[in-house]
């Protein structure tokens, strides 16, 4: 029997230390030098040790969680020049981290949260973990796992913008108007908002888990339809982007559903949302 509440707090600490408080600069430094890896390990250990403030946890368990994370990351650092691809290293790395936290929750007896946290609803912690999971970690995983599809979509976009710019310039030259001053290479930066796609994906996953919690699976189809309508023009004109869009959308929804089922059916099996009792209309029975 696993210790569900302990796993939730350890998993939250893992998400915070491995994703939210690991900026891109530190991630790059971690790949280039061992000092960056040590700095990341110290930040991660800080969040793991903070679990003691929330759950009555022995110190040795928190130290084991911190040291095991450092060992796994060190092995990944040594394998960075191997034949394993970045997506494969990322999957193995996160799987081992998750497995370690799960084993620690199994090997420890049931532990209670601190008394000052009793004012919060029991479902607060799995919901907090779920939101943390489907936000930045999934965005990072999309960038790593589907990097080649994203690059193909970007190259396709640049080619389309260049062709459009050339057509516009040719039309202006024919009309004897030399008003086109913006280089074609700058057009993609003017036409796209940086980070908008990541926010769309995050909101999509949050809405998905809300629909799943309420049993409204049909509403997920409407969500996908609305998202597809917003991107219809680019999907219809760019096969590379269409593939990347479809893969990213299906992956995003799949992760949201699996994350919800894992946290609420396996780790912390409680009813997250109480659905109202359906109203049944009945005809009055005739009087005797």
Give residue ranges: language-model regions.
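Transmembrane helix interruption/hinge and helix-loop junction motifs
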Residues: 1-4, 51-61, 212-219
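Interhelical loop and helix-boundary elements at the membrane-water interface
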Residues: 16-41, 72-213, 230-255
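Short hydrophobic alpha-helical segments that form membrane-spanning helices or hydrophobic packing faces
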Residues: 25, 47, 104, 222-226
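Membrane-interfacial alpha-helical segments at the cytosolic side of multi-pass membrane proteins
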Residues: 46-54, 103-108
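Transmembrane helix-loop-helix
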Residues: 48-70, 77
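Hydrophobic alpha-helical membrane segments of integral membrane proteins
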Residues: 60-65, 88, 221-225
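Hydrophobic transmembrane alpha-helices of multi-pass, membrane-embedded glycosylation machinery
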Residues: 66-70, 225-231
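Juxtamembrane boundary at the C-terminal end of a transmembrane helix
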Residues: 259-288
């Amino acid at each position: 029997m696993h210790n569900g509440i302990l796993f939730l707090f350890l998993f939250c600490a893992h998400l915070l230390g491995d994703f939210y408080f690991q900026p891109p600069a530190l991630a790059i430094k971690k790949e280039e030098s061992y000092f960056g890896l040590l700095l990341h390990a110290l930040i991660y250990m800080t969040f793991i040790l903070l679990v003691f403030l929330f759950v009555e946890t022995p110190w040795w368990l928190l130290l084991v969680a911190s040291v095991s994370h450092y060992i796994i990351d060190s092995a990944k650092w040594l394998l960075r020049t191997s034949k394993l691809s970045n997506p494969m290293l990322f999957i193995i790395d996160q799987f081992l981290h998750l497995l370690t936290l799960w084993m620690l929750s199994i090997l420890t007896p049931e532990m209670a949260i601190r008394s000052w946290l009793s004012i919060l609803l029991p479902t607060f912690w799995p919901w907090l973990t779920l939101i943390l999971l489907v936000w930045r970690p999934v965005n990072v995983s999309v960038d790593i796992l589907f990097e080649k599809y994203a690059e193909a979509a970007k190259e396709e976009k640049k080619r389309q913008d260049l062709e459009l710019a050339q057509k516009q310039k040719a039309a202006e030259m024919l009309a004897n108007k030399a008003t086109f001053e913006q280089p074609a290479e700058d057009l993609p930066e003017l036409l796209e908002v940086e980070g908008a796609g990541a926010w769309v994906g995050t909101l999509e996953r949050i809405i998905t888990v809300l629909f799943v919690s309420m049993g409204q699976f049909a509403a997920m189809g409407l969500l996908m339809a609305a998202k597809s309508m917003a991107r219809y023009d680019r999907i219809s004109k760019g096969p590379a982007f269409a593939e990347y869009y479809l893969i990213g959308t299906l992956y995003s929804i799949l992760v949201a559903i699996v994350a919800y089922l894992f946290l609420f059916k396996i780790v912390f099996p409680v009813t997250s949302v109480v659905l109202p009792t359906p109203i049944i209309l009945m005809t009055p029975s005739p009087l005797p």
